[in-house]
């Protein structure tokens, strides 16, 4: 892979992502550090439509809580990345609270670079399906470039059976747990700012009550020197599971599937109640309101100090 660093350096000088500055578009460094000090986690909420973005920002502003606004390749058919990215960046800049514009599950170095060029303040490179050594190599490359932009990088080690569209998969959780020894070397050689780990959560809808190996969090946290850890597959867990994970070192929780279901149910009820006098934009308002309500609910779980 050939990368033109002269072009990248010019673009880096144009980027200005503050860890804790006056602008509201920030990278993850400051908000994760604050979460660690406060013993809470920040939420990562996906932008699959304008309504999901507007609802999440409104929730953040009403509660005064920072969050991560994310776009994943799995949402491409709902809202193409080239369309979503400028909207997400503008939403973050205009917000009254700190917002991270973040690429979720970037599945190639090229996509991560594209996100940075489009103004994202953070990217996730997901090389969890790659051989371990190749995951290290490509993640380190993304970190080198992203840090020159002033952006942060989340990576993933270990894997989860997943489909971000919410489809079900058979799985054996123990097969996917993150290994602490591999995590220690991975973090040291890549320079990542946050690490998504696997300890029993899954993307999408749980087929049965989840069995979470909280001890894995303890072991990985110890091995990686208290690096901020990330939990994917946050939908469908009980409040106690969230708080247990956070108490052990989870500092970012990704949440999408059950929020999308909640918004869908709200729209279904609205359509049923307004038969014969329905306009499309009314559905959009209903969906935005439902997203806002559910995001606020999750934000309060992740940080019990939030009123």
Write out the residue ranges for each language-model feature.
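N-terminal pre-domain/capping segments
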Residues: 43-47, 51
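Active-site proximal loops enriched in glycine and acidic residues that flank catalytic Cys/His/Asp
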Residues: 199, 233-235, 257
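Alpha/beta enzyme core
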Residues: 28-34, 50-70, 74, 82-96, ...
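Short gly/pro/ser/thr-enriched loop/turn and capping motifs at secondary-structure boundaries
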Residues: 75-77, 130-132, 259-264
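Glycine-rich beta-to-alpha transition loops that act as phosphate-gripper elements at the mouths
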Residues: 47, 101-107, 228-239
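N-terminal amphipathic alpha-helix/helix-capping segment at the start of soluble metabolic enzymes
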Residues: 20-43
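C-terminal alpha-helical cap/extension of soluble enzyme domains
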Residues: 238-307
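Short, Lys/Arg-enriched N-terminal segments with co-localized hydrophobic residues
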Residues: 2-23
């Amino acid at each position: 892979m050939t990368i033109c660093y002269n072009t990248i350096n010019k673009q880096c000088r144009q980027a200005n992502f503050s860890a804790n500055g006056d602008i509201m578009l920030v990278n993850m460094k400051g908000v994760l550090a604050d979460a660690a000090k406060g013993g809470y986690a920040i939420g990562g909420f996906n932008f699959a439509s304008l309504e999901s973005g507007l609802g999440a920002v409104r929730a953040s502003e009403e509660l005064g809580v920072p969050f991560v606004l994310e776009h994943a390749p799995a949402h491409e058919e709902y809202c193409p990345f080239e369309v979503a990215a400028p909207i997400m960046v503008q939403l973050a800049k205009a917000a009254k609270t700190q917002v991270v514009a973040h690429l979720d599950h970037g599945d190639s170095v090229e996509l991560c670079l594209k996100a940075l060029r489009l103004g994202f303040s953070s990217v996730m490179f997901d090389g969890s399906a790659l051989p371990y050594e190749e995951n290290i190599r490509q993640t380190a490359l993304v970190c080198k470039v992203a840090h020159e932009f002033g952006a942060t990088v989340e990576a993933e080690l270990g894997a989860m059976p997943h489909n971000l569209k919410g489809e079900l998969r058979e799985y054996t959780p123990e097969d996917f747990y993150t290994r602490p020894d591999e995590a220690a070397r991975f973090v040291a050689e890549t320079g990542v700012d946050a690490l998504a780990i696997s300890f029993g959560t899954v993307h999408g809808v749980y087929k049965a009550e989840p069995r979470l190996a909280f001890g894995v969090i303890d072991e990985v946290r110890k091995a990686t020197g208290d690096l901020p850890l990330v939990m994917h597959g946050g939908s469908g867990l009980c409040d106690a599971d969230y708080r247990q994970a956070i108490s052990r070192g989870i500092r970012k929780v990704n949440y999408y599937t059950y929020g999308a279901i909640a918004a869908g149910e709200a729209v279904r009820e609205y359509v049923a109640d307004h038969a014969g006098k329905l306009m499309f934009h009314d559905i959009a308002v209903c969906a935005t309101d439902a997203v806002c309500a559910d995001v606020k609910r999750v934000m309060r779980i992740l940080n019990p100090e939030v009123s």
